[in-house]
């Protein structure tokens, strides 16, 4: 989860867009129009331990040295409306190449629907909250991520579904997930594993903070879709 993509771009021969370079682009393979987005952020631990510099808080021992703060799970490339990438995506979804494609596929890193841990907190810029004692000394620095400001669920998902995208492919949580939205868009999460071990389902919960201003979903898909779970039933007729 590094901001520097130079090595990746040097190793792989990638399509290039005029605006996004090798970071986000679109290409046609036969009947498929593939749109690749640059949607990723700085991964930080969800731990609330005193020595943790995580997505929800700063390390206690660095409270008075802001130059050592991590500033939460910040986003590498803007994707919200008005950003360069969002405007490029709008243009691509309205292009002749996209509209004429039989199959419309979008690929990105961050999940849109998942049972995995990494969809929480919301994909939005962290909101810093500094707590002080009566003498003005910093006692805590924490970060909130308002769910209603999630750029992906609020802005990107409606845009993709309205444009007729049939499949959205992503990774990040290192498990296998499949969802289908009411309008028929398929959401598939996969990586180097073909199982759903570690999914936040039933007794397994995500590590989320309690007592914060925002509520962070510990079980299930935070954005309301039921998973289509893998089964061996079809093998038995």
Regions found by a protein language model. Name each.
Residues 2-106, 111-237:
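Metal-dependent phosphoesterase/phosphodiesterase active-site architecture
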């Amino acid at each position: 989860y590094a901001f520097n993509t130079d090595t990746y771009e040097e190793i792989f021969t990638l399509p290039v867009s005029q605006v996004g370079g090798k970071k986000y682009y679109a290409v046609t393979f036969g009947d498929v129009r593939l749109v690749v987005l640059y949607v990723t952020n700085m991964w930080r631990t969800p731990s609330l331990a005193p020595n943790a510099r995580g997505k929800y808080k700063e390390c206690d021992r660095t409270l008075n040295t802001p130059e050592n703060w991590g500033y939460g799970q910040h986003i590498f490339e803007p994707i919200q409306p008005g950003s360069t990438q969002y405007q490029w995506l709008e243009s691509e979804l309205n292009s002749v190449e996209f509209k004429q494609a039989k199959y419309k596929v979008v690929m990105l890193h961050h999940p849109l629907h998942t049972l995995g841990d990494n969809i929480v907190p919301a994909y939005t810029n962290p909101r810093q909250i500094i707590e002080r004692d009566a003498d003005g000394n910093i006692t805590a620095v924490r970060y909130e991520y308002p769910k209603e400001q999630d750029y992906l669920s609020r802005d990107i998902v409606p845009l993709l579904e309205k444009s007729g995208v049939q499949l959205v492919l992503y990774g990040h949580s290192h498990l296998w997930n499949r969802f289908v939205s009411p309008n028929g868009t398929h959401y598939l999460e996969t990586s180097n594993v073909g199982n759903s071990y570690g999914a936040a389902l039933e007794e397994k919960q995500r590590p989320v903070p309690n007592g914060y201003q925002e509520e962070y979903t510990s079980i299930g898909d935070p954005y309301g879709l039921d998973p289509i779970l893998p089964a061996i039933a079809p093998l038995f007729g």
